[in-house]
Amino acid sequence: MLNEFKEFIARGNVMDLAVGVIIGAAFSKIVDSVVNDLVMPVVGALTGGGFDFSDYFLPLSGNVTAQTLAAAREQGAVFAYGNFITVFINFLILAWIIFLLIKLVNRARASVEREKAPEPAAPPPQDILLLSEIRDLLKQRA
């Protein structure tokens, strides 16, 4: 059973999946940085200057009077929809980047396949076709 497990792990698909998961984890940090350090400041500047979605919340308790999410959570229950907005924007950016990467890879594969594809053979000349028909007819009579 141990040998079967070793064979399973050594397969290309499992190794490719492992590499993909590791790269995906690292890529997630890059996307988080793009969203938090590049996109969100621009969104904040366009919408009135320097606000942060993470402090958007609705108090679910009458005791909550704080202006920041961390302080509001200490006072009572809150509906922290700002974090959801940030995560959703993060997801959209990640999905867009993955879409562009897949499109780029598919385009590269298609160009490589076009280069590898042999030119279709030119049809034989009419005289060769005629001679082939005559040969076939002679074989049938014999």
From Swiss-Prot:
GO terms for cellular component: plasma membrane. PROSITE patterns: MSCL. PANTHER family: LARGE-CONDUCTANCE MECHANOSENSITIVE CHANNEL, MECHANOSENSITIVE CHANNEL MSCL. The keyword Nucleotide-binding does not apply. It comes from Sinorhizobium medicae (strain WSM419). Keywords: Cell inner membrane, Cell membrane, Ion channel, Ion transport, Membrane, Transmembrane, Transmembrane helix, Transport. The chain crosses the membrane at residues 14-34, 82-102. InterPro entries: Mechanosensitive_channel_CS (IPR019823), MS_channel (IPR001185), MSC/AndL (IPR037673), MscL_channel (IPR036019). Homopentamer. Belongs to the MscL family. This is Large-conductance mechanosensitive channel. Channel that opens in response to stretch forces in the membrane lipid bilayer. May participate in the regulation of osmotic pressure changes within the cell. It is a multi-pass membrane protein. It is found in: Cell inner membrane. One of its GO terms (molecular function) is mechanosensitive monoatomic ion channel activity.
